[in-house]
């Protein structure tokens, strides 16, 4: 099995470069990518740099804000040590297989290793055409760019595994979508951009040699502990199943709807990736769909765990030639691994839901207690985020009931549930102060409300960016009360409600 370190092309001189690139994926066979330079833009202007993330990656934020840094972030200049490529992958899109997708408007500049020794990709999104662009122009409008910046950084602040956003650049050019819009480029950071669809790309071609090379690379980079397993490829699959089950549970605990859970948007590192038509639930409805292209609700909120499990089954199909005998035994092993998804998901979900309800001890009936609350919320139009936040003040003080009751169309529905909840809380050994502190740490006050994101996008399209910057700052502290910004916690008024979201590609 190949080792990641053997593929590194870093030299001592690279360490002093403004961006300390240490590239490995670009040393894989050329079937994995196309070498391509970003397309230059007319008048790049820096909109935002994520200073904290830059420092984590051992990049001086001052460089990124300099003329040379802006030139690199806009694709107008190639930084020393960068080896730009567009990655190849395939994917199932809404259940239909497409044998070649790939980075049609994104270019991987290279990789860096952070201060803790963890490797990250640095990628430009909206940086021009590649051979995978099909009929696209390779560009991005400012709306999808700032949407991904807002939501990915909010997810990180919520503690949910996610790709990150390092910078946003305005291109000074216009892009044509349903109307003419200002262009932008996002600098995305990810543990990697290896997707289920990356494995499907080689499996669909019967290219077992490169499939094995890809699996070896992924194991060395993300799951090195499985190298010593009797069947490392099966152990690799088991690890990805567990990781993605836990990730999907985290989504369900904050009311996040990805919107386009295709296999090419499923990262094997277990990070949330590709935020196109994503949204957060306001009033709780388990069947909620926002994405304009999800006409049949395939990726509705309640369907997300099943969608991820389906994607993992496709991942298993791609890996079959590497597992066991590659035949009947491999299928048997893969099926057993997929069957474990529900156990991983249920354990993570119930553990998270217990904390949201102030429960520490594991007791029978806890899942039913949580499910009953969600049913009552759905029937009474209760806001998902605000209900759980308000419970923090009601767990040990009935004076807090009024705030929760006010979120229910029929307050008696909450009254009936809260009797059971308080009875269950009485079996805990925590002090009220400890319980409240713990609940406040997992039940956010602030999420990226859809109407707030849309307001930031509208302002940005008009050349006003204050809303974007303020929203990013508020969402960086989602568990703090922030009285000055209390309005950001409120659900939309009827005229503000966002009913559909769009990819914007």
UniProtKB/Swiss-Prot annotation:
Keyword Hydrolase: no
Source taxon at top rank: Bacteria
Keywords on record: ATP-binding, Magnesium, Manganese, Metal-binding, Nucleotide-binding, Nucleotidyltransferase, Transferase
Reaction catalysed by this enzyme: L-seryl-[protein] + ATP = 3-O-(5'-adenylyl)-L-seryl-[protein] + diphosphate; L-threonyl-[protein] + ATP = 3-O-(5'-adenylyl)-L-threonyl-[protein] + diphosphate; L-tyrosyl-[protein] + ATP = O-(5'-adenylyl)-L-tyrosyl-[protein] + diphosphate; L-histidyl-[protein] + UTP = N(tele)-(5'-uridylyl)-L-histidyl-[protein] + diphosphate
Signal sequence range: none
Enzymatic class: transferase
GO molecular function, one term: magnesium ion binding
NCBIfam families: PRK00029.1
Family that this chain belongs to: Belongs to the SELO family.
HAMAP family reported in the protein's UniProt record: YdiU_SelO (MF_00692)
Function: Nucleotidyltransferase involved in the post-translational modification of proteins. It can catalyze the addition of adenosine monophosphate (AMP) or uridine monophosphate (UMP) to a protein, resulting in modifications known as AMPylation and UMPylation.
Protein name: Protein nucleotidyltransferase YdiU
Organism of derivation: Nitrobacter winogradskyi (strain ATCC 25391 / DSM 10237 / CIP 104748 / NCIMB 11846 / Nb-255)
Name of encoding gene: ydiU
